[in-house]
Amino acid sequence: MKGTYREISILLPAYNNVCVPLVEELQRQAALLPGLQYEILVADDGSTCQEAIHQNRLIGQWPCCRYIERKQNTGRSAIRNFLAREARYGRMLFVDSDLHVCSPSFLKDYLEAEGDVVVGGILKGGDASRLASNLRYRYETDYQRKHDFSHRQQAEDKDFSAASFLATKQVMTICPFDENFKGYGYEDVLLGKSFSLHGFRIVHINNPLLMDKYEDNDTYLQKTQEACRTLYVFRTELRGYSKLISWQEKLQKHPWLYGLLRKSFPWASPWMRKWLTGNHPSVTLFNAYKLLYYIHLHEKDEAI
């Protein structure tokens, strides 16, 4: 896929968030590129927030924009596949609708990039002092230091993120999102693996979108547990693409320690949750919580 200014479909899945400013900026940048044929499609995936739906309807009144309301929530994979089918043009830019453009050349930089799949990355931001007690902010900023642009280039398929990436319609037809993923998490990890298995080159560029909104600690812990359950269901497919799986398999080789850890989550989790939802959440403790919960899922399954 060679860089070109000819055409692009910009695809945004939306759920319970207002993305009017994001679409406005994407449209502004697209309109400034000479000769570019473009469309911006926003698909609402059965949102329950009527205020978000009401505000986002404005998008449908803008040139080259469509706002599609879906009555039923179909999940993160299915809504993206729906957008890919609806897209008019051969090159498609997927953008999560809760992010922000932080570069005036964001769209231009994507269009000039070459590769079967191009990933721009995510920059974590926000007021550090105000967010000091936010678990996700702490985790994401710590994660960012270990997965910056240079690190992403070294592990192309294993550092794939669906929050912002460019691909052709042909690539997405061969490698669609797996719609068996109904819950939160890991659908993009498996997609990155699928790209690699089919021989598609994943190119990472330094063209991030900004993430600066973070859910409260309790909500994030609930989402984390949902992601762990998703990982457990698809553990065979995701082997080699998750550190949780790797750690669980390593610990399993030490029966005494593993047996202790398998039974520790029920009594350890209450005080861990209290600490993680408090004013001084620890990333180290959070990682331990995830591992214990993931191991606990094996214990529950084996007890049936």
Segments the model singles out, each with a brief description of its role:
Residues 26-69:
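Acidic donor-binding segment of Leloir-type glycosyltransferases
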Residues 70-87:
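Glycine-rich, basic loop-to-helix element that forms the pyrophosphate-binding segment
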Residues 92:
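Short aromatic/hydrophobic "clamp" motif used to bind/position activated sugar donors
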Residues 104-135:
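Conserved donor NDP-sugar-binding/catalytic core segment of glycosyltransferases
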Residues 121, 137-157:
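Short, flexible, basic/aromatic active-site loop/helix in glycosyltransferases
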Residues 183-191:
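Acidic donor-binding loop at a coil-to-helix junction in glycosyltransferase catalytic cores
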Residues 201-235:
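Active-site donor/metal-binding and catalytic loop motifs
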Residues 226, 243-304:
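Non-catalytic, C-terminal membrane-associated alpha-helical segments of glycosyltransferases
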